[in-house]
Amino acid sequence: MLGLGTITKKVFGTPNDRKVKSVRPLVAKINALEPEFQALDDAGLIAKTEEFKQRIAAGESLDDLLPEAFANAREGARRALGLRAFDTQLMGGIFLHQGNISEMKTGEGKTLVATLPAYLNALTGKGVHIVTVNDYLARRDAEWMGKVYAQLGMTCGVVVPFQQEDEKHAAYAADITYATNNELGFDYLRDNMKSELSQMSQRGHHYAIVDEVDSILIDEARTPLIISGPSQDKSDLYVTIDKVIPELVEEHYTIDEKTRGVSFTDEGNEFLEDRLHALGILPEEQSLYDPESTTIVHHINQGLRAHKLFNKDQQYIVRNGEVVLIDEFTGRMTPGRRLSEGLHQALEAKEGVEIKPENVTLASVTFQNYFRLYDKLGGMTGTAATEAEEFAEIYGLGVVEVPTNRPIQREDEHDQIYRTVQEKFDAIVKTIKEAHAKGQPILVGTTSIEKSEYLSQLLKKEDVPHNVLNARQHEQEAQIVADAGKLGAVTIATNMAGRGTDIQLGGNVEMRVLQALAETPEANPDEIRTRIEAEVAENKRKVLEAGGLFVLATERHESRRIDNQLRGRSGRQGDPGRSAFFLSLEDDLMRIFGSERLDKVLSSLGMKEGEAIVHPWVNKSLEKAQAKVEGRNFDIRKQLLKFDDVMNDQRKTIFSQRMEIMETDDVAEITRDMRHQVINDLVDEFIPPKSYADQWNVEGLYAAILEKVGADTDVIKWAEEEGVDDEIIRERLEKASDEFMAAKAAQFGVENMRRIEKQLLLQTIDQKWREHLLTLEHLRSVVGFRGYAQRDPLNEYKTEGFQLFESMLDSLRVDVTDKLGKIRPLTEEEQQAMMRQIAAQQAAAQAANEAARQPQPAMAGAGAEAEEGTPAEGFVESDPTTWGNPGRNDRCPCGSGKKFKHCHGRYT
C-alpha cells in the first residue's frame, strides 16, 4: 500500500522533478544550436569566445549567453577530446552555473560537466576556480580539460603544493584554475601575510566549482587550515606523561566514543597526583585542581586521548619516523596535517618517534568560511541529497539530483547482519570466493587499514588473488583502481570517496596502452591500442555476463553518504552491478548506537552461529541511527560555525585593512591618525575631561609623549599659560608630533620614510593579529564553562571577542606610533660595525664549511649539507645593492651554500 507522501509525489511531482523540468527548454535551445557551431572551423570557435566577451562587456547577462556558450563549449570538447556532452551533462552544467550542487552518479562525466559553466563564467575575465580533493586530480583534470579550453581560446592553470611563485601567479592569472581545497585556502592565508600587492597570487573569489563538494564542505568543514610557527619545546613533558598513561586502569577514566571525549574519575585523579608528585612534574604542595595545573591536566588528557581514541593503522600510520594522519572519509594519508593542542605530540610520544614542537597559529581559516568568500559557488558529487539541509543553511546552495544518462541497473541488496565479527568475515570470504569463481569483479570496502589487511590475510589463506588499496599503497592507487573492473578481480579498499578514477568493466584501455608502450617502446602504438581495445571489449562482455561489478561493504559508516559513495562505484553508465553490506553487532556503529537490544531480539529468535538476519526493517533502523549521527554532527558543525563567525568577521576586517594599506603608496595619513589617537588617549589619561588645572598631571603627560610618540615637547610650559585648556594642549601636541615626524622623514628621505611606514605598519598588524588569535583560542577553550553560571557561552564569546579585538587595535596604534617615533638612520660608524659583524659571521661560516668538507665518518640518518659555491658575479659584501634580489629560500649570493634567510638575508 502506497503512503500519502508517495501518492502526492506521483500526482504533483517532487521539487527536484520540477527543477529538472525547468531547464529542459534551455537544453533544447543548446541542442538546436549544435549544427551552427559544428559548421564553424577551429578559428571560428575562438572567434565566438571573443564575441561573447565583448557582448558581456556591453552588458549582456551570462544567463542570456548560456545556450550559445554551452553549445560552443560542447563543440570544443567534441573536437579536443572526442567527448560530446549528453543532455543530462548539459543539465548538470546549468545547475552549477545557477549556484547549485549537481548530484550526478559515478560515471556520469562530472569532469566534463564542469567545463561548461567554467567556460561561461570565465568569459567575464574574473577567473574561475575548479576545486578537487587531491593534487593528482587537479593535475589530471587541468591537463585533460585544458585541451578543451585551448580549443576555445581560453587559458587553464593548475595550482599544486611547492610550486614556484611565478608558476603559481601564472596559474591564478589563467581563465580557469584547477586546485585543491587545501592549496586554495593556504594561498588565501599566505596572500594576506604578504607585504606587496605584486606578491599576492589570488586575484579575487568570483566563482568556484567544487568537485566532491560533500567531502570538502561537509566532511572537512570543521578542519581549520592553519599556517603556524614553532613554539616552546615541551617534548620531555610529553614523553614523561606518556609513560604514566599505560599505568592507568579502567576505573581511572571514562571514554565517550560518541563525542570522542575522555575524563578522569576521582580515583584516576588521586592516582595521577601521586604519580606526578613522585616524578617531580607536579610540585608537592600543588593539586591537579589548582589553576597552575591547567597545562599539566591538558597534557594528561591529550595523552589519554592518544592512547584510547587513536588507533595505529586506523586514524594514523607511522611512516619514515613520522605520525601521518589518515583522512577518515577518504582513507588517504594527509602528510603535513597535524592535530592541534598537543594531541599530535602525544601521538608521537606514544609511538616513540621524534616529537616536533607545538606550533603557534599565525593565520587560520576554515573551509566553511573560505568558500563563503566566493560571489558564486557550485558543486558536484554523487551523494549530496542526505545533506541538503546543511548545504542550504550554511552555504545557501540548493541540491538538484540530475537524472542519469541511462537507467541504473545495480541491484542493492538488504544488509546482512551477523552476531560476531568473525562470523561476518567468514561469510565475506565465502561470498568473495563465489564471485571470483564466476569471474565477477568485486570491490570490498573496509573502514580501516587494519581491517583491510586482516581480510587480505584471510583471502591469502584461501588462495584468492587480490589487490589491497589503502593509505600504505596510495602510490599505486590509479593502477589498482584501473584493474578493479577486470574479469575476476578482487580489490580490497579503504574508503573510496574521492578516488577520482572510474572503475571500468573489463579493464582500463588507456592505462593498459601506457603500460604496453612502456614495456615495448619500439612497438606500433596503433596496433597495441587496437589489440588492447579488442581484449578489453571481450573481457567486458564476460564481466557483464557475470553480473558486473559487485561492491561488498564490510561495515556501515556513520554517514549514509559515504555508504552511498561506495555503492555508486558499481552500475556506472547503465551497467549491471550488485551491492551488499555485511555487518555484525560488534561493529563500531552498531556497538555505539544500541546493538544490545538487537542482540537480545536475535537471541530470542533462536539465531544460530553463522546465520545472518536480512530484513528491510533492519535497514530502516540502521538508516535512522545514521541519520541521528548525521543530525548530531550537523548541529556540532553549525554551533562551531557560529563561534568561528566571530573570528571570521574580525579576520575579514583585518585582511581588508591590510589590503587597503598594500594598495596605498603613502600611508602617512594612516600613521598620523594613529599617532593623533594615541595623543588623545594620553591627554584624556593625564588631563581628565572637565578637570581643574591643579588636577592635571602635566609631568606624566610630558614623559608619556616622549616615551610613546618620541617628541620632546613644551607641554609643561603650555600648561602654565593663562586660559589653556585640554583641547589647546591636544592640538599643540598633535602639531608638535607632526613636525617631529616631518623632520624624521627629511632625515631618511621622503620615499624611504613612506616605505618604512608601510612595512612597519604591515608587520605590526601581523604580529598583533597572531597574538590576538592565540588569545581567542584561549578564550574559546574556557568559555564553555560559563554555561554553568547560566550564561550563554556564544554570547559571552562574542562580547569578549569584540572587546579583545578593540583592545588589539588600541595596542596596534600604540606600537606603530612608538616604533616610528624611535627609528633613526644608522650613523656611518654603525653601518661599518654592522658590515664588520657580517664579515666575521661570514668568515666563521666559511671556516665551518671548510671543516665540513674534510672526510668524516658516515653517520646514519645524517641530512644532506648545503652546497657551497663561488659568490655571484658583482657581489660586494659591504654593499647590499650588489646582492641582487634573492628570495628568502634561495641560495645566498655570497656563495656560502646557505639559504638567503639564514645568511645575508638576516641583515637586510
Swiss-Prot record:
Protein function: Part of the Sec protein translocase complex. Interacts with the SecYEG preprotein conducting channel. Has a central role in coupling the hydrolysis of ATP to the transfer of proteins into and across the cell membrane, serving both as a receptor for the preprotein-SecB complex and as an ATP-driven molecular motor driving the stepwise translocation of polypeptide chains across the membrane.
The enzyme's E.C. designation: 7.4.2.8
SUPFAM superfamilies from the UniProt entry: Helical scaffold and wing domains of SecA, P-loop containing nucleoside triphosphate hydrolases, Pre-protein crosslinking domain of SecA
Name under which the protein is recorded: Protein translocase subunit SecA
CDD domains referenced in this protein's UniProt entry, alphabetically: DEXDc_SecA (cd17928), SF2_C_secA (cd18803)
GO cellular component entries: cell envelope Sec protein transport complex; cytosol; plasma membrane
PROSITE patterns named among the record's database cross-references: SECA, SECA_MOTOR_DEAD
UniProt signal peptide: none
SMART domains cross-referenced by the UniProt entry: SecA_DEAD, SecA_PP_bind
A GO BP entry: intracellular protein transmembrane transport
Catalytic class of the enzyme: translocase
Taxonomic lineage from the root: Bacteria, Pseudomonadati, Pseudomonadota, Alphaproteobacteria, Rhodobacterales
Low complexity composition bias: residue spans: 848-864
UniProt catalytic activity: ATP + H2O + cellular proteinSide 1 = ADP + phosphate + cellular proteinSide 2
Alphabetically ordered keywords of this record: ATP-binding, Cell inner membrane, Cell membrane, Cytoplasm, Membrane, Metal-binding, Nucleotide-binding, Protein transport, Translocase, Translocation, Transport, Zinc
Mode of membrane association: Peripheral membrane protein
Region spans: Disordered: 848-895
Recorded GO MF terms: ATP binding; metal ion binding; protein-exporting ATPase activity
Pfam family, one: SecA_DEAD
Residues that, per the record, bind ATP: 89, 107-111, 502
Entry keyword Transcription regulation: no
Source organism superkingdom: Bacteria
Protein family (similarity comment): Belongs to the SecA family.
InterPro entries named in the record: Helicase_ATP-bd (IPR014001), Helicase_C-like (IPR001650), P-loop_NTPase (IPR027417), SEC_C_motif (IPR004027), SecA (IPR000185), SecA_CS (IPR020937), SecA_DEAD (IPR011115), SecA_motor_DEAD (IPR014018)
Subunit field text: Monomer and homodimer. Part of the essential Sec protein translocation apparatus which comprises SecA, SecYEG and auxiliary proteins SecDF-YajC and YidC.
Subcellular compartments: Cell inner membrane; Cytoplasm
Cofactor(s) of this protein: Zn(2+)
